[in-house]
């Protein structure tokens, strides 16, 4: 449930161009504390580009990003401190152990006192026994778990996860979803990009559906059902909305 009057994540008029290609165009949405929002869309819809702009890995061509009440352009350190980000493809430091990764993240965010919490997170994700393993020796699934664990070390106000469930075993996926719900219930804003529509339907309080760089629909499941007459499930509505979306015009 949405418990905050002021959104903790605000995207306003976001554009991102790569040469003549407009990957994201005039994107505006917000995520308030106490809700999980799913960012959905087919391949090439602009989801990852949007999340990378939020995480400061890409600089927007135009528009504004505010995280935890801080403008990412004018107050970048404060904005980044409020954010926990998990990329689509985890890339841990090869020569750091699992435990050293968490200690590094805790130090970077001034959360050295949270190592008891870090231990609990590793145990929930079945990484505690691997805490001495180097990043280079981890499997793909373990790298994904490590990236997720690092996101929970400091008490972020905004969580931004790009396809976090890919590569996780069933127990790991279940634990991560429960941890996201717990973060929401504690008042955080959670944005999750996923292609797993059945998971999004069960996990998310709202969804934002993108296609060709723009939002084509957003709302709760009840709101989508009221506006989208085609389809009883999120998957059916998603396919209908993305098929009807206008073709993107590449600027000359």
Task: Show which residues each predicted segment covers.
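Conserved ABC transporter NBD signature motif
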Residues: 63-71, 78-79
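Conserved ABC ATPase "signature" region
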Residues: 103, 107-130
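Hydrophobic anchor residue at the start of the ABC signature
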Residues: 148
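Catalytic Walker B motif of ABC-type/P-loop ATPase nucleotide-binding domains
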Residues: 159-163
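A short, surface-exposed alpha-helical micro-motif characterized by mixed small hydrophobic
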Residues: 200-202
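ABC ATPase "signature
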Residues: 218-219
């Amino acid at each position: 449930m949405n418990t905050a009057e002021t959104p903790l994540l605000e995207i306003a008029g976001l554009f991102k161009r790569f040469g003549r290609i407009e990957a994201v165009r005039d994107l505006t949405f917000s995520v308030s504390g106490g809700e999980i929002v799913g960012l959905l869309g087919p391949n090439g819809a602009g989801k990852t580009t949007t999340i990378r702009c939020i995480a400061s890995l890409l600089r927007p061509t135009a528009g504004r990003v505010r995280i935890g009440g801080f403008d990412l352009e004018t107050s970048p350190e404060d904005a980044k401190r409020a954010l926990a980000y998990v990329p689509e493809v985890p890339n841990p430091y090869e020569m750091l152990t699992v435990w050293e990764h968490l200690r590094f993240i805790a130090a970077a965010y001034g959360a050295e006192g949270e190592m008891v919490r870090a231990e609990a997170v590793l145990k929930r994700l079945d990484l505690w026994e691997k805490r001495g393993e180097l990043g280079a020796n981890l499997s793909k699934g373990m790298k994904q778990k490590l990236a997720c664990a690092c996101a929970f070390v400091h008490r972020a106000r905004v969580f931004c996860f790009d396809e976090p469930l890919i590569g996780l075993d069933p127990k790991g996926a279940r634990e991560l979803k429960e941890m996201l719900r717990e973060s929401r219930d504690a008042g955080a804003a959670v944005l999750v990009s996923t292609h797993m529509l059945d998971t999004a339907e069960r996990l998310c309080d709202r969804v934002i559906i993108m296609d060709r760089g723009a939002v084509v629909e957003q709302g709760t499941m009840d709101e989508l059902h009221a506006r989208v007459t085609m389809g009883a499930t999120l998957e059916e509505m998603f396919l209908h909305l993305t098929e009807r979306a206008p073709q993107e015009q590449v600027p000359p």
